[in-house]
């Protein structure tokens, strides 16, 4: 364990020099061993689930223990048994990483819970035995909503992590209590002005131009279909404003003069005719819309298979993996464009040039000034996008899915 700690610190030092950050997963759940070792930290009978996606159109029953609200904090405000357990869990997750993704943040504010003893043989459960914790009456002191601002946020700051940079995943169903705490920064009437979160922008069908607020955006995750499947003939993207060729071309290649107007028109036609170009443009638009984007491994490698069908018990869930020759496969995909793998330098170059073009179109800078500011960056991006397309040894294999 001592060697592991030393290695983690050395890895962090190397990444710091390279400007690279790792994001660890903070899973809001506990093991049976945690329950056995800390009986007072958890509620009896109650378990964490999800309001939708279960059997017979009911909730998902995850069988995850629920922290006891009564032992989160002592009377003097210090951490109680379950509060200490949670803080230690967050601390362990932060060891060796520079940021975290909270899965799911609802579980740290207002989890959806159910009585395990009330679950029927067919998996169904009465509405009276399941709800968001805030509606059950088992937390009269409102301790659970305090977790976010009194345990999670302070712990992040102790590790020099800006809460606004954390990736938060919700369940797609947000309770009023959650919205007050997360977006309003409210706990028992007090407003934490500097800790209001902005969340993630699920941008699959949205325009990113002029978007304000979200720190992260994404097209797909491990819980839904990869973007490669969106390119199929008849897909909804071909009739969606967020994927409209004229919008994407105008936003990414502003026609600020005759020469650029011609290039923008050609780009627009390519987006219209070529599904791969349309996806490439949509990815570049994400880089223009928010400071950060979230990318699933399936999208990065252009895989058209779904990693996990969210809300379903599927025998193939979580089994998709890369082949042992994935680096060659990736380079081959970029070289031949037979799979919509993401060429990051190329996408960033489009986004940077878009920003340059927009500043010129708005008369914020002259063309020579705007291009001079990014000349070094665009030159390097131009170089590396081509390097990634260079031929690799002929060892191409399909992605494995079992």
PLM feature segments, named:
Residues 8-27:
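Conserved, well-ordered alpha-helix/loop/beta-strand core segments that scaffold catalytic motifs
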Residues 302-379, 384-390:
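Structured C-terminal cap/extension of enzyme domains
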Residues 393-402:
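Long, low-complexity, intrinsically disordered segments
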Residues 38, 213, 274, 339, ...:
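Intrinsic-disorder/low-complexity coil detector
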Residues 1-9, 29-294, 298-301, 313-314, ...:
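Alpha-amylase-like alpha-glycosidases and glucanotransferases acting on alpha-linked glucans and related
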